Amino acid sequence: MDFANVYLGLDTLGNEGYGASVSNGTHHDFHFNFNTFRDGGNHEVGEKRAESSDIGVYECRGPVQGPKDQTSFPSNSHNNYASIVGDASIGHYLKGPERTSEVSLPQTVNLSEISNNNDKGQPTNTPPVRSTIVAPSLYSEGSTLNHYNNGSHQVLHPQFQNGTNAPYVVQSNLMQNNVNLTGAEQEKGLDLYKNSATANNDEIFYNLESLRREGYLNSNKKQSQSPNGDYNSSDESCSNKTVASSQRRGTPGSNNVHTASNNETPDMKRRRFLERNRIAASKCRQKKKLWTQNLEKTAHIACEQSKALRILVSQLREEVICLKNQLLAHQDCNCEGIRQYLSSEAQGIMSFQKH
């Protein structure tokens, strides 16, 4: 059971603080009694109680004080109320002077800031953080503020009744800095974040597409052009032959083409020839790619067939050896064929040894 979570859970009135009086309990049913107070030390009539089997009997006298991230906070006896807010790790809590033994809390509590209360119960630093933001699920559903103000008792949420559960910690600095924002302002900020994220994604996608297109065009230009930037002489000769043949035909279309070619500037002719060269090179690359793929498929099929044949040869050799062993095993039988085979094999072995 986290000691500070009890305070955060009861902090539903905004800037009002809460203090803990001396707790009472038995061996198996411990509980804390909490009295609320406003600025000026005016106590509310209602009394709150938080029950849990993991809560020990602690005497929470005096204000909890200490710098940020300090783990030990002494307790004074002149004040019966303590308000806990802030970003600190509370590892243990000390009892009053009449009980000098140190009492360890089950878990470490992470808060946002530490503020002290004077004898009148007025906060000197930062007001308490609202529990609806820091610990919204501390109490069970269905509980209201009027229910607490009427002096009724409320049991903690089941998830906080187990000592092994970690306390509810706000890990984002953005949430700690904007705890006073309303729900509408938070939704507005979330919408702005979504819109900005969508705009950034669209911009990144547009930039990637433009870079891809430019890189594709540049790669084609590099592949089509020679190191000196000259076009292919064969394509140029082919284009010249085409123009000459069209001129020999003497058709009106050929005359128009001849007139257009005469009106072209050297740069325009160069672009046209380079475009034809790119088209021819692209077709050549496609044919080469198809030929390579077909060759790879043929080689793969041949390799598979060779592997299968090698396996078959090894199996046949094993079968021949097995048959020879069977013949040797039946050499004492009255079979003329077996005897002739064994004698021929023996003569072959003897002749091989002589040579």
From Swiss-Prot:
Residues 269-307 are annotated as: Basic motif. InterPro entries: bZIP (IPR004827), bZIP_sf (IPR046347), bZIP_transcription_factors (IPR051027), Leuzip_Jun (IPR002112). It holds the Pfam family bZIP_1. GO terms for biological process: regulation of transcription by RNA polymerase II. Its main location: nucleus. It comes from the Eukaryota. GO terms for molecular function: DNA-binding transcription factor activity, RNA polymerase II-specific; RNA polymerase II cis-regulatory region sequence-specific DNA binding. Residues 267-330 form the bZIP domain. GO terms for cellular component: nucleus. It is found in: Nucleus. Residues 218-271 are annotated as: Disordered. Residues 309-323 are annotated as: Leucine-zipper. The keyword Transcription applies. Belongs to the bZIP family. This is Transcription factor atf21. The lineage of its organism: Eukaryota, Fungi, Dikarya, Ascomycota, Taphrinomycotina. The gene is atf21.
